[in-house]
Every structure is written in C-alpha cells, then in structure tokens.
C-alpha cells in the first residue's frame, strides 16, 4: 500500500487549526499553494522590477506569458477584455506554478485536488455572473435563451442552458484536477516500472523516463492554458452578450 501511486495526493495536517467549529488546518497543500504564490511574485518581481531596453531572458519569458494572456483576452473578448488582464494573468501564473511545482520529486500537486481547482473555477464563475449583471442588468438572463429559439422550445432551452451554465465551474475544475492526477499517477507507475527494468536493462529505460517527464511538463503548461482560455470564453459571455 505504501507504493500506491495515489499516496502522493494525501492531505497531511501540519498545524491543526480549528476556527468557529471548522477545520482550517495548515496542510501540505497550503504550503505548496503558498510556495506557488511566493515563487510567482518573486518571478514577476525579478522580471519586471528593473526592465531594460535589451531585456534579460527572465524579462522576455514574463513578457511572453503576459502577451499570451493579453492575446487570449483580445481574441475572445476584444478591447473590452483589457481590464481583466490582471485577474486572468494572475490565475494563469498561479495555476502554472502549482502544476510545475508538482513535477519536483517528493512534492505535492495542489491542483490535483478538486477543492483547489473548484475554488479557482468558482472565482471565475462568480466574476462572470457579477460582471454580466452589472453590465447588462436583467438582460443578462437572455444568455439562457439563444436568439431565434422557437417559443414552444424556449422552456426546454432555458433549462438546458441554465444547467450548462451552472455546470461550468464543475467541468472546469474537474478537467484540471483529473488531468493533473492522471498524469502524476501514470508518471509514478512508469517510474516504478522503470526502476524494476533497470535491474535487467541497466540505464536503457532512463531516456523513456526523461521523455515522459518532458511530456508531463508540457501537460502542466497546457492545462494552465486550457483553464485560462476557457475562463476568457466565459468572460466573453458576460461582456459581449449574444
């Protein structure tokens, strides 16, 4: 049981804290989320604090990420999406660092837990809903009735669209958590298998392990991108009501 690939996802209490009857203990998940936040802020500080005409590699990498997020908002929302750059950029950076931290040996992947990803998805869901009502008022409810829907079909379409809308934070959070968990389980299983193979094949399985780790890093970046691009699409529904 100690070799189970799922043991890496166990939540461990480090500081037991009770508040108003609720368990708000400081856990290994808390540490890695705090570490991801600290590393994100440090990275951005070092990249942008002393900007130069001829940028450093760190500055170039940060500008690439910033432009990526800005392009996502521009392509999905247009010029009106610029005001959401701080929110979406912070979201992307945080998820990216959480995902990448999980790739380090004996670490913990915070984004493999649904409570973490659902909280992030709920933040986007509430932002979209609030922005939609502020910008369009009651007209925002027309989002649940596609234009041109026949009157006799309207009640069914409203129910379907409302259910789809309410399911957004669930699907968004499950997608990220499931992909991160599946990837790490696969990596753990193949790593254990590779160690066994090394007894007979010496160092031959190592290149396979390197390729797999590289693929997992790609998946970590891709999942942060997918979460962010879907968030931009949801924001577009609130701003450019169709």
Curated annotation (Swiss-Prot):
Pfam families xrefs: ATP-synt_A
Gene3D superfamilies: ATP synthase, F0 complex, subunit A
Record's keyword annotation contains Acyltransferase: no
Membrane topology: Multi-pass membrane protein
Gene Ontology CC, one term: plasma membrane
Domain of life: Bacteria
Segments passing through the bilayer: 29-49, 84-104, 114-134, 140-160, 189-209, 210-230
Molecular functions per Gene Ontology: proton-transporting ATP synthase activity, rotational mechanism
This protein's record includes keyword Cell inner membrane: yes
Keywords: ATP synthesis, Cell inner membrane, Cell membrane, CF(0), Hydrogen ion transport, Ion transport, Membrane, Transmembrane, Transmembrane helix, Transport
Principal location listed in the UniProt entry: membrane
Localization per Swiss-Prot or TrEMBL: Cell inner membrane
Membership in a protein family: Belongs to the ATPase A chain family.
Role played: Key component of the proton channel; it plays a direct role in the translocation of protons across the membrane.
NCBIfam families per record: ATP_synt_6_or_A (TIGR01131), PRK05815.2-4 (NF004482)
Description of how the protein assembles with itself and partners: F-type ATPases have 2 components, CF(1) - the catalytic core - and CF(0) - the membrane proton channel. CF(1) has five subunits: alpha(3), beta(3), gamma(1), delta(1), epsilon(1). CF(0) has three main subunits: a(1), b(2) and c(9-12). The alpha and beta chains form an alternating ring which encloses part of the gamma chain. CF(1) is attached to CF(0) by a central stalk formed by the gamma and epsilon chains, while a peripheral stalk is formed by the delta and b chains.
Name of the protein in its database record: ATP synthase subunit a
Annotated organism of origin: Rickettsia prowazekii (strain Madrid E)
Encoding gene (name): atpB
């Amino acid at each position: 049981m100690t070799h189970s690939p799922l043991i890496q996802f166990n939540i461990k209490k480090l500081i037991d804290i009770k508040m108003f009857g609720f368990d708000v203990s400081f856990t290994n998940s808390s540490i890695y989320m705090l570490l991801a936040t600290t590393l994100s802020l440090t990275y951005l500080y070092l990249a942008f604090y002393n900007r130069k005409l001829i940028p450093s590699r760190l500055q170039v990498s940060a500008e690439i990420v910033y432009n990526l997020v800005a392009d996502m908002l521009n392509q999905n929302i247009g010029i009106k999406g610029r005001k959401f750059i701080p929110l979406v950029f912070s979201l992307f950076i945080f998820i990216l660092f959480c995902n990448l931290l999980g790739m380090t040996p004996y670490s913990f992947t915070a984004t493999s837990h649904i409570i973490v990803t659902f909280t992030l998805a709920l933040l986007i869901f509430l932002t979209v809903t609030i922005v939609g009502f502020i910008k369009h008022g009651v007209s925002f409810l027309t989002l649940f009735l596609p234009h041109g829907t026949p009157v006799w079909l309207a009640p069914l379409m409203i129910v379907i669209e409302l259910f789809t809308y309410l399911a957004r934070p669930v699907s968004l959070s499950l997608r990220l958590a499931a992909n991160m968990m599946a990837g790490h389980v696969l990596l753990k299983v193949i790593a254990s298998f590779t160690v066994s193979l090394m007894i007979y094949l010496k160092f031959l399985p190592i290149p396979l392990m390197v390729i797999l780790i590289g693929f997992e890093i790609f998946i970590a970046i891709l999942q942060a991108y997918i979460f962010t691009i879907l968030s931009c699409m949801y924001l577009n529904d609130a701003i450019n009501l169709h």
